[in-house]
Amino acid sequence: MAEKRNIFLVGPMGAGKSTIGRQLAQQLNMEFFDSDQEIERRTGADVGWVFDVEGEEGFRDREEKVINELTEKQGIVLATGGGSVKSRETRNRLSARGVVVYLETTIEKQLARTQRDKKRPLLQVDSPPREVLEALAKERNPLYEEIADVTIRTDDQSAKVVANQIINMLESN
């Protein structure tokens, strides 16, 4: 990979976007960004607080702006928030400005990976987590698929193995 293309990771919560993104950036010697962490850095508050105070719509507005700015950079790996694809503008920008990698996972893996994580505002509701994740998958999976240049299942694989798969796929294209 002579020229460093932007790599944008999309997928549901618990797919491993942040962990795999860090690994990928390290292996490729690229700068890593996480859109949720960038929102937290800019607001001085965690994502849950932003959701509570501004609602999902306010959070999504911030997310769209952050992703727009970050995707204008060159040679980065960006882990996006699971719901960022709800915005048509964001989907268009991701598609136009880099390679989109959809990290796919099962509901079971999502449950296992997110069960103790209190920083998941969409899971801090009265509905059972499985029902929430199934509803989100039904809404968002087609959007991930729509913009994905590459799809990789992350179940039962280490971040390093998935990062290597992504690198191999990018080098062969």
Curated annotation (Swiss-Prot):
Q: Respond yes or no to whether keyword Magnesium is given for this record.
A: yes
- Catalyzes what? shikimate + ATP = 3-phosphoshikimate + ADP + H(+)
Q: Where does Mg(2+) bind?
A: S18
Q: Which keywords describe this protein according to UniProt? A: Amino-acid biosynthesis, Aromatic amino acid biosynthesis, ATP-binding, Cytoplasm, Kinase, Magnesium, Metal-binding, Nucleotide-binding, Transferase
Classification via NCBIfam families: PRK05057.1 (NF003456)
Give the record's subunit note. Monomer.
Q: What is the similarity comment for this entry?
A: Belongs to the shikimate kinase family.
Q: What is this protein called?
A: Shikimate kinase 1
Protein source organism: Yersinia enterocolitica serotype O:8 / biotype 1B (strain NCTC 13174 / 8081)
Name the gene that codes for it.
aroK
